[in-house]
Amino acid sequence: EEESMGKLLLTGVDGNLGQLAADVLLTLEPVENLIFCGYNEESLKKYAEKGVETHVTNFNNPDGLVEAFKGADALALISMPFVGAKRQNAHKNAVDAAKAAGVKQIIYTSLVNADDETNPSVEKKDHIYTEKYIKEVGLDYQFMRNSQYAEAMVTNYFTYAHMNAPLTNSQGDGLMAYISRKDCAKALAYALHEFHHKVWNINGLELMTISTFCAIGDVSTGNHVPFVNVTDEENYQIWDAMGVPRTTDGVFLKDSEAPFSS
């Protein structure tokens, strides 16, 4: 039984989440059970040196994906760092290739409440699409519905602290259970390591408003960053003024305080 088991494949090992998940996986599995894929050849080298099978993959282009995924039983698909039709297409390419390569299960990093279609955020639509598509092609799945990474919000907090300005956005008094990216990575690695058929909600312990988050930041750092609520449109204008592109296809400023799109 054991010998017929295929390998475990992790995509996106050159990204923040993927790198953390790769490190956990290496403590759980022998290297000969693993395949690591990434966009950036340089970042794959250290794993190849350890004896892990590695492949350079670009999900925007389906060429070569089936070959890269061959021999894997389970594949962890970390969602792409862009939004909209481009991301949906990239995810579709990866899922199609997994199916064609004989992969049995996809473990996909989705978003908390992805199945709640009453909240049609731009970010969420891609996750709804990908979850549905994985089911449609008939692959077994685990969905890791991750909450907002705490680290991203800490970066956001310091952006405003450095500008000596209030943290301004349209979150209002919305509640969020922030969670460390490290915990999400650990959950992903274990989901790949142990077979389940499940939708996981990967949440922080405590729901809090952004005001509470800022207050915790103030106590921890000695800064003073109050929260100011604005409309979505006003929020876009603030980011525009900082030179932040509105979409992930926009031009990112080098060394920007805000390395993301609005």
Predicted regions and their residues:
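Oxidoreductase cofactor-interface core, primarily capturing Rossmann-like NAD(P)-dependent enzymes
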Residues: 6-44, 60-63, 70, 81-92, ...
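A short hydrophobic/small-residue beta-strand
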Residues: 54, 105-106
